[in-house]
Amino acid sequence: MSTTLAPAVGAPPASGRDDTIPRLDLAGVWVVIPCYKVRSHIGRVIARTPDWITGIVCVDDACPEHSGEFVTREVADRRVVVVTLAENQGVGGATLAGYGEAIARGARVLVKVDGDDQMDLAHLPALVAPILLGQSDYTKGNRFSSQSHIQGMPSVRVLGNIGLSFAAKLSTGYWNIFDPTNGFTAIHADVAEILLSRPIARRYFFETDLLYHLGTLRAVVRDIPMPARYADEISNLKIGSTILPFAGRHLRNWARRMIGDYFVRDFNIATLEVLVGGASLAFGIAHALAWISVRLPGQAASAGMVMGAALPIIIGVQLLLQAINYDVTHTPTQPIHPYLRTVKQMAATDKLRALSAAPDRRD
């Protein structure tokens, strides 16, 4: 019996199959597993992968434990393909290499799963369903959708993720998401194919930087609720050494997004609000500081002086808040992968027609 997605409310009875519900075993879903120091877990992760998954790409990221060789030798699952990288490229580099391999083999949806057995594969249908139904281009887990989901998560991680989530909202433009560092993700292959040529961060900033590049494509991103899960893995992430680099990269992406979205690719009401609001706020602050620097000891500010500084500041803050509101309400809502798929199919059809119309040059 083939695995299918659960029918939606109002679906026809079981006696008549609804063709709008995609069959998972025919959906072309591939799993990509970056492998670095996961030899003790990788076999269990592969064994738990559902039968409806078409293929599994294990990417040995120059693993000192030779995880790739271990999988080749010990795992009999015929769906498994092992890719070995000559040099360590980080989780991002390994994931992108896996994407490329799966796309070359005809994958339609790509799911990234860590090899440390932290991710509950029972959530795979929920992760791929919005993509298969044409509702989203990229989905990711969100461990903060319920208080019960973060029970057992260390307090440091909770606070860190809250801070990173807010920073990611600013730098990526996806105000509708949370938990940006969650590595349990799925993406449509046509969207991933475009990202392969982008300068995406290869290491721990990968998931957040990927969101930034998805934002430049206006791809639709959706959170999938799931609980936190921790096994006996040892994290390779050193929090103290990544805070400043992460902050710098968020600031860089925010600046690039502001320039790209509001000055290069578009010029709209939010652009004017940023320009006028920023200038008004700067003028009000400068006016107040200038008076403070020249005032006599004990001299009180006149009503005109106060209003001359306060009014521009108030107007500037209000305009900037309106610009933020515009940014929040213009999160992408129209998936791009149906368009990309149609363009690709049309190009392939035109190519076939051109070949068939070409004169026969055989002697």
Describe each region flagged by the PLM.
Residues 40-44, 65-74:
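Acidic helix N-cap motif at the loop->helix transition within catalytic regions
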Residues 60-69, 87, 117:
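A conserved acidic beta->alpha catalytic loop
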Residues 28-30, 55, 209:
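Cell-envelope/extracellular polymer assembly enzymes that use nucleotide-activated donors
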